[in-house]
From Swiss-Prot:
GO CC term (a single one): cytosol
Free-text note on domains in this protein's UniProt record: The IMP cyclohydrolase activity resides in the N-terminal region.
GO molecular function: IMP cyclohydrolase activity; phosphoribosylaminoimidazolecarboxamide formyltransferase activity
Pathway: Purine metabolism; IMP biosynthesis via de novo pathway; 5-formamido-1-(5-phospho-D-ribosyl)imidazole-4-carboxamide from 5-amino-1-(5-phospho-D-ribosyl)imidazole-4-carboxamide (10-formyl THF route): step 1/1; Purine metabolism; IMP biosynthesis via de novo pathway; IMP from 5-formamido-1-(5-phospho-D-ribosyl)imidazole-4-carboxamide: step 1/1
Family stated for the protein in its record: Belongs to the PurH family.
Protein name per its UniProtKB record: Bifunctional purine biosynthesis protein PurH
PANTHER family (alphabetical): BIFUNCTIONAL PURINE BIOSYNTHESIS PROTEIN ATIC, BIFUNCTIONAL PURINE BIOSYNTHESIS PROTEIN PURH
This protein's UniProt keywords: Hydrolase, Multifunctional enzyme, Purine biosynthesis, Transferase
Upper lineage: Bacteria, Pseudomonadati, Pseudomonadota, Gammaproteobacteria, Aeromonadales
EC number: 2.1.2.3, 3.5.4.10
CDD domains, per database record: IMPCH
A Pfam family hit: MGS
Biological process terms in GO annotation: 'de novo' IMP biosynthetic process
Amino acid sequence: MENARPIRRALLSVSDKTGIVEFARALQQRGVELLSTGGTARLLADAGLAVTEVSDYTGFPEMMDGRVKTLHPKVHGGILGRRNTDDAIMTQHGIKPIDLVAVNLYPFAATVANPDCALEDAIENIDIGGPTMVRSAAKNHKDVTIVVNAKDYTRVLAEMDANANSLTYTTRFDLAIAAFEHTAAYDGMIANYFGTKVPTYGVQDEASADSKFPRTINFQFIKKQDMRYGENSHQAAAFYVEADVKEASVSTATQLQGKALSYNNIADTDAALECVKEFAEPACVIVKHANPCGVALGNDILEAYNRAYQTDPTSAFGGIIAFNRELDAATAEAIVSRQFVEVIIAPVVSEEAKAVVAKKANVRLLECGQWQGKANGFDVKRVNGGLLVQDRDQGMVTLTDLKVVTKRQPTEQELKDLLFCWKVGKFVKSNAIVYAKDSMTIGVGAGQMSRVYSAKIAGIKAADEGLEVKGSVMASDAFFPFRDGIDAAAEAGITCVIQPGGSMRDQEVIDAADEHGMAMVFTNMRHFRH
């Protein structure tokens, strides 16, 4: 057997006590002696298990309200002692070998996530003895097994049963890696939290408020998938996800069928899903190369899909389709019978819809679960030698936020379309222009270096598909620096505009809208997307 080590003595000390009684009982049934500390020891004893308190084993009591429990040579000597090398000195000092350590750490992240958390609470939830034992056991994985995740209890027991109560080196090494990842993430959380207590850079006042952004920033992501290649075929790639993410997302979605998701599939699906989350009504978003090419609302998702597809059938070919309602069979049939699609994602997929999509085996079908709003957090962009870190763009406007700046007031329908259009524009690459009518996009101008050309492209798109622009509204993700964008929109038939405002030439732009009889509202909020 491959460098197997028998498990005869285990030290159990956990904050997350999920499954620990069952694990301890199973170990004891296999003849393993149990050592434990504090609350874990009491829990095991109350469950009728024979357990030795670490303080009884070391002859040294827990002290300082539990701050010092396991920091003792008889504990760490038992973990770090090299079998067949340190045996004599261990015997000389009465140190018993500890073969398995099951430890997880004080709930620091949960503590500091509480908005009422005081600095003292955070400090008392910094684990000292736990990480020390974890690192000691992981360092000595040649002889010792470390378990930091309750999900591994079953794995350990199964291998013990298969190997006469022993564990292989491969398993010990794998668990040691998990342990180092665990302590790295834990220390990163602590550094991130205390890093926000440093005075904001550039502010000399020592009493300045805490910074939202720590002095150093630590992230930990877990590899979910190796990919055939990245954005291009000559680039290697993998997909990493955050641990314990609760928000419905492409990262947490379950793939029901189809080929493995590609790098570009994941990026585009994220864009489509985040856009469709903006809407309360049944909605469909079709994305191509990270830009919405068709977005619409409907009485149901079939109507929403048909209308979104109508915006730009050419670009929808090979696109990503996202819904904010259950995917039903009728909608699935409409999609697969009409177009080539890379990915379909919805909160739920009916059994009937699964059967329909199964006829197209290569279509990637994802189920992401329902969502309750969007979580706050950071957006990160990599630049050469650095990271740009900012809040997620959660900004949105309501009717009460709109400021009418023209002589003509928007109609009730125009106001409804303006808010729809504004939500879509948030997800279009800058410079972004969106034309919409009756809660349906009719033209999207994305990613142009001049705003007027984005406006012209939106009009061209609508004309190419035979969509009537007259009476439509336009959203711009940033202000118009000149009146030319308004003139182009008016020529296409736009009657109402929503934009942030804030240009030195705002009055010139407003005058242009008045000349054309258009209504215009300012949001005082920009939605650049690069």
